[in-house]
From Swiss-Prot:
Record protein name field: ATP-dependent helicase/deoxyribonuclease subunit B
EC number: 3.1.-.-
Molecular function in Gene Ontology: 5'-3' exonuclease activity; ATP binding; double-stranded DNA binding; helicase activity; hydrolase activity, acting on acid anhydrides
Gene designation per UniProt: rexB
Subunit structure: Heterodimer of AddA and RexB.
Required cofactor names: Mg(2+)
Function: The heterodimer acts as both an ATP-dependent DNA helicase and an ATP-dependent, dual-direction single-stranded exonuclease. Recognizes the chi site generating a DNA molecule suitable for the initiation of homologous recombination. This subunit has 5' -> 3' nuclease activity but not helicase activity.
Miscellaneous information on this protein: Despite having helicase-like domains, this subunit does not have helicase activity.
Origin species: Limosilactobacillus reuteri (strain DSM 20016)
Length: 1260
């Protein structure tokens, strides 16, 4: 008969000491062939083994330096116990299915059962569904609920007409039951999972005679799963002795509390442990033939923690069970050992913790392994932990799980297998190459140099975007003409002697390298995939492809590279490859002999899903790189008990305590219904959110009590998104009870931080970071410019001097490593010092270099050299002078992509409009006549002709349209807009006397084209230079009135544009006025009698959306007309305006004007009516802007001076749409003085002054 004993005590007591004492006693007093097993959670197995063996050694009188081992004692987890006892049994020889294999098996089952599912049929393809379903199935197995049990429960629920179980619940349970039955059928007799493993262990414990000689000590388990509970029950009834340690202040019952009916209330801190104890005690009483329950419970009475932690232990036990009055106080023996603080944010919090750890270790009283940092959840800190602790030069081990699903090998596999289904998109092929795991081989068979291949891939990526290369055929073509068209740079002449060693040759070689690699080495693998008949053949083809392509060589190279830098990163390639091999092995085991269905794309998609499911379940193994390091973990994870100091970070009220939300497929309500039909002694599901909330105090309590000497609470005041956070009630109430302040840890830049530099001294790098922050703050406070030094606080001045001194000491060290660190520190200090004097200023080019850069010779002109410029270039100059230099001096360009960009759309629009207007004029047709229904067929033919001509004008457009469905849709929208606009043009002619007379009128030379229809705008500059301004007017309309011909300029826009006086005044919008000046300078060339300028207008090209409610007021055609009004500048001549829009007396269709009953015509904000004098003033202003820009450009004195215009709540700057922000390095905090602030009122005042001057002139 075996025995069942308990060791109880709070977390402040040393349970392990009692267990080891009992272990030593039993080892001495039992036969030599008896064996002993010390069972703990897997997370702490290694450290517990060290502690237990050390305890055994000490009790045998051996010193710490003596070697010690004990073959009779094993420290194991439950899973390792199963392996240890079953490793030679037939059951254990079955294929062991890992989490990855389970996920793959679930994925396969779900795919097969998808058509039979009621609720989940639409979710089977959703990301994460397979993981959730796998977890749910395993949860049911761990709860000892079989598929047959589930079927029986569903039947009983239906029979009982349980009102809680509605149709949705039944549908969900039907789906789970369907999948579960298929899942169990696949597992049965072939595989062994964790649940089956535990069942086999229970069977072994019940049948093997060897178990009667085994003694078990179970420690540090707060609760057992149903499977673990079965194992414990089997140990109790079959082993020689079982001793269980629980964190519990008393037994239910025990020698001091004999009433077996007495149970604690749910608000008792140890409620879960008490219920666990009572269940085990009750089980022992029910099996008195097999086991004797020891009468007296052993209590751990030796404190494991210091006195202050014992005070916390007593306080929290009471705090969880009953309210403590706000006036109650208890004084800590040493307040330094229990601290409470808040910080500004999580980053400041981590830096504070790291600084304290660094300083405590520097005191010589602590090692890094003495510190444990805990948080309820580490998600908010995950990206900060490594860089912060690296800056403080603190070794850290983050045991938070890390998934493999973002590793380049995973990206390679998923992208490769999805290529056919996604149509061999170029973006996917480039992504595949950018994993850098697939590299071409040289003629010798070696992998080519990675840097050369990377350069070729980047070049090819840009080229493919520029040429809109898409699809398998584009990559695999052998047609010389297609290769020349798609894969050779324009101007390539292989027979030209100058071609060799040229940039063209290098470009073509890079393109050929990547194209050939993809066509001849990557894509052929899909032919091998097509030939695969079974799952095993498919897996073999994939493995052989990766091996042949040198993927293993690349992974090994990565491992070798990181082995001397970061051991954690160095282990990842091997772990990922091992995981991949395991996935393939389990895939072959599960699906290897299954014949693949027809349809390679679908087969590969399914295969990819299985691989992704496998990798999504895989994690990197967490192996500490060194024993002496700080551990970062989460509460709820069992920790070893040898940490002296615990930092509880993130102590905020949203997670301490936390109301957890279940993300499993079965909700808490689902589980509540299910639990009502379970055998509570044999089957039980994990606790619901309410159960977990009851356990929250205990979870945090065990976290607090990991500390032996100090417990430090820390809480950020705000989250990463600046959301305000409040401190935890646990932290607040404990601080109040012990009369301790919740100290706000100051920023280094605050007054307190400036006065106490010592609080921020850590490793050199982290200290420098704080020193920089303080120095900047002091400079701002003292108003110190870059040419002066601020007066630093004494403490920080000492810190700065100490860092310089330290750098010099290290540089003089005989140790080469220390010397290198000294040089690095010195360089960083020099860089920091220089940074305070850095200005984001642009050096002047000087006029000679500027003139050499910008000036060109003018043909047949001896007046000097000429600055050729376009309107958009000068607008860029006024937006930001430095951007002009980058674009037109250095000729920097953003990556060219063959897309339906604004430029290409504009070209298409203009060509279509030009063709339409020109054809009508050449055939002496009337725009107004074409608006009539009788001429609709002729008009449609003209529109089709215009569209064809516009498309032929851009040969690459057809290739772009055929490259993707998105481009096809965009083109359809584009042609619809053009059709709408051409019809609108005809309808507008019915309401105006103005007619288009010219389109696409070019003045000056554009690029390499022939000189335009009209001459350049030629303005003289300083030093006998000239600026030739070029442009293209979209349309010129003519209104004949008496002997005069009034000309208006029309500029097409794809978005809504208004003439903005302020933008025109400051040079931000030069187009309309420059067009007028260009037209005026060439009036004699127009062959028009008595030409006069009537205005300049924008016309928006769009297909407007008309609200249904508006159709009640006007017809659709009229509403469309009003949506296409001309907006801009017009002469304020009533007779002219009435001719321009003959509908003014009713409702203006063509212009944003309104004629009142008194005959006056006024414009709304979308048009500006001007007098001839005002128009002259605007044109002269425009001319001066052009001349000033030209002189400034040639002076070479260009500035980084983006404009800034504030109008009400609107803010516009010259940086809003720039492609060169990374080049500018413009800092909105430090470079405010570089903005060129514009006065929004100045232009209006100047414009109004023209009116006043005219009035005064009239009076004279």
């Amino acid at each position: 008969m075996g025995t069942l004993g308990f060791v109880l005590g709070t977390a402040a007591m040393d349970h392990q000491q009692v267990l080891i004492d009992q272990l030593v006693d039993q080892v001495k007093n039992t036969p030599a062939d008896d064996t002993f097993y010390y069972l703990v959670p897997n997370h702490i197995k290694f450290e517990t083994e060290i502690n237990v063996l050390a305890g055994l050694r000490d009790r045998q009188g051996l010193s710490g330096s003596d070697r010690f081992a004990s073959s009779r004692v094993q420290v194991l987890s439950f899973s390792r116990l199963a392996w240890y006892l079953l490793r030679d049994t037939p059951a254990f020889q079955k294929q062991h299915l890992s989490k990855i294999g389970m996920a793959m098996l679930t994925s396969q089952v779900v795919q097969e059962q998808a058509s039979d599912l009621r609720l989940y049929a639409s979710e089977v393809k959703q990301p994460g569904f397979i993981q959730k379903m796998t977890a749910q199935l395993e949860e049911l197995k761990n709860a000892n609920i079989t598929a047959d049990d589930l079927t029986d429960i569903i039947y009983r629920v239906k029979s009982a007409n349980d009102p809680a179980a509605n149709q949705a619940w039944l549908a969900k349970m039907y789906d789970v039951e369907t999948i579960y039955h298929a899942y169990e059928a696949r597992l049965r007799d072939r595989y062994i999972g964790n649940s089956e493993l535990y069942r086999q262990l229970v069977s072994y414990l019940q049948k093997s005679p060897e178990v009667a000689k085994m003694h078990f000590f179970i420690d540090r388990f707060a609760q057992f799963t149903a499977n673990e509970q079965q194992v414990v029950d089997a140990l109790i009834t079959n082993a020689a002795s079982t001793t269980i340690s629980l964190t519990l202040d008393r037994g239910y019952p025990d020698q001091n509390h004999p009433n077996p009916q007495e149970l604690p209330p749910k608000n008792n801190l140890f409620y879960s442990s008490a219920m666990q104890f009572h269940r085990l005690w009750k089980f022992g009483q029910m099996h008195q033939k097999e086991v004797k329950v020891l009468q007296n419970v052993a209590f751990a009475t030796t404190p494991r923690v210091d006195a202050e932690l014992q005070q916390v232990d007593s306080y929290f036990k009471r705090y969880a069970s009953e309210p403590i009055g706000p006036g109650e106080r208890e004084e800590l023996l040493d307040p330094q050992n229990i601290q409470f603080m808040t910080t500004t944010n999580r980053m400041t919090e981590l830096n504070n913790v790291a600084t304290q750890i660094r300083q405590l270790v520097a005191s010589g009283k602590y090692r890094y392994r003495d510190f444990l940092i805990l948080s309820r959840h580490l998600d908010g800190y995950q990206t900060m932990i490594e860089p912060v602790f690296a800056a403080h030069n603190i070794p850290v081990f983050n045991d938070h799980e890390r998934l493999m699903d973002n590793h380049p090998l995973v990206t390679l596999l998923t992208t490769l297998l999805e290529l056919p289904q996604r149509g061999y998109r170029t973006a996917d092929i480039i992504q595949l190459l950018k994993t850098w795991l697939l590299v071409p081989r040289t003629g010798t068979g070696d992998l080519m140099g990675l840097s050369d291949f990377q350069a070729a891939v980047f070049t090819t990526e840009n080229w493919c975007l520029k040429q809109a290369i898409e699809g398998k055929n584009a990559w695999t073509t052998n047609d010389p003409e297609k290769i020349k068209q798609l894969w050779q740079a324009p101007g390539t002449n292989l027979t030209d002697p100058k071609y060799e060693q040229s940039r063209l040759e290098k470009l073509n070689d890079q393109l050929a390298l990547v194209k050939d690699f993809v066509a001849n080495h990557l894509l052929p693998v899909f032919d091998q995939f097509k030939q695969a008949q079974t799952g095993q053949e498919l897996a073999t083809a994939l493995y052989q492809f990766l091996a042949a392509m040198g993927v293993t060589d690349r992974l090994y190279a990565w491992q070798q590279y990181q082995s001397t830098r970061d051991l954690d990163l160095a282990r990842q390639p091997q772990q990922v490859w091992t995981t991949f091999c395991q996935i393939l092995q389990e895939y072959v085991e599960i699906l290897g002999q299954q014949e693949l269905r027809d349809g390679t794309n679908e087969v590969l998609a399914d295969f990819s899903e299985l691989l992704q499911a496998g990798f999504a379940a895989a994690q990197y193994s967490q192996i500490p790189a060194t024993l002496d390091q700080v551990v970062v973990s989460e509460t709820g994870i069992v920790q070893s008990e040898n940490r002296k100091v615990v930092f509880m970070i993130g102590s905020t009220d949203d997670v301490m305590p936390e109301m957890q939300e279940s993300d499993s497929l079965l909700t808490d309500q689902d589980k509540d219904i299910l639990s009502a039909y379970l055998d509570e002694d044999f089957q039980y599901l994990p606790g619901t959110a309410i159960d977990q909330l009851i356990d929250e105090p205990f979870v945090h309590y065990t976290g607090f009590m990991n500390a032996k000497e100090q417990l430090i609470f820390s809480a950020p005041q705000s989250d990463s998104d600046d959301k305000e956070l409040s401190i935890s009630p646990y932290m607040h109430d404990m601080a109040r009870y012990f009369g301790q302040p919740v100290r706000e840890y100051p920023l280094a830049t605050s007054k307190a931080g400036q006065d106490n530099a010592i609080d921020f001294v850590s490793a050199p790098l982290a200290t420098i970071n704080r020193l920089v922050e303080v120095s900047r703050q002091i400079r701002d406070e003292q108003g110190v410019g870059i040419d002066r030094q601020p007066v630093m606080p004494v403490g920080w001045q000492t810190v700065a001097e100490s860092l310089v001194k330290l750098a010099k000491q290290w540089q003089q060290s005989a140790d080469a490593k220390v010397q290198a660190e000294g040089i690095s520190l010195g360089q960083r200090l020099s860089l920091v010092a220089a940074g305070f004097h850095y200005q984001n200023k642009i050096d002047s080019l000087g006029n000679k270099l500027a003139q050499a850069l910008y000036l060109r010779a003018a043909p047949d002109d001896e007046r000097g050299r000429v600055l050729y410029a376009s309107i958009s270039q000068l607008q860029d100059f006024y937006i930001n002078q430095y951007e002009y230099f980058l674009k037109y001096g250095l000729r920097l360009q953003k990556r060219d992509e063959l897309t339906l960009s604004n430029d290409r759309i504009g070209t298409f629009f203009h060509k279509a409009m030009e063709t339409f207007v020109t054809t009508i004029r050449e055939n002496n047709l009337s725009f107004a006549d074409l608006a009539h229904k009788d001429n609709q067929m002729q008009r449609d033919q003209l529109i089709d002709h215009a569209l064809v001509t516009a498309q032929e004008n851009q040969p690459t457009l057809l290739r772009l349209i055929n490259s993707s469905a998105q481009a096809q849709f965009q083109y359809q929208q584009l042609t619809a807009i053009v059709k709408t606009m051409l019809i609108t043009l005809c309808r507008q002619a019915e309401y105006t006397g103005s007619q288009p007379v010219k389109t696409e009128v070019q003045f000056g030379r554009i690029g390499n084209q022939q000189p335009g229809n009209l001459g350049s705008l030629d303005y003289p500059l300083k030093d006998n230079h000239h600026i030739y301004l070029r442009g293209r007017i979209d349309r010129i309309d003519n209104l004949k009135q008496g002997n005069n011909n009034f000309l208006t300029v029309v500029d097409y826009k794809s978005s809504n544009h208004l003439f903005d006086l302020t933008s025109a005044y400051y040079g931000l919008s030069l187009q309309l006025l420059t067009y007028l000046n260009g037209l005026q300078a060439n009036l004699t060339e127009l062959e028009t009698n008595n030409p006069r300028l009537a205005g300049a207008l924008y016309l928006r090209l769009n297909n407007p959306t008309i609200k249904a409610a508006e159709l009640k007021k006007s017809s659709l055609d009229d509403l469309k007309l009003k949506e296409h009004q001309y907006k801009g500048i017009l002469l304020n001549d009533p007779q002219l305006l009435r001719e321009l829009d003959k509908s003014l007396d009713k409702q203006a269709f063509l212009y944003p004007l309104k004629e009142y009953k008194n005959g006056k015509i006024k414009a709304n904000k979308e048009a500006l009516l001007v007098t001839p004098q005002q128009l002259d003033w605007l044109q002269n202003m425009n001319k001066e802007l052009v001349i000033n820009a030209g002189n400034q450009i040639l002076s070479g004195d260009l500035k980084l001076n983006p404009y800034r215009l504030l109008t009400g709540s609107n803010r516009r700057t010259g940086l809003d749409y720039s492609d060169f922000l990374d080049v500018f390095q413009f800092d909105n905090m430090l470079d405010q003085q570089n903005y060129r602030d514009l006065n929004p009122n100045l232009a209006k005042e100047a414009f109004d002054n023209v009116v006043q001057d005219d009035d005064e002139e009239d009076k004279k």
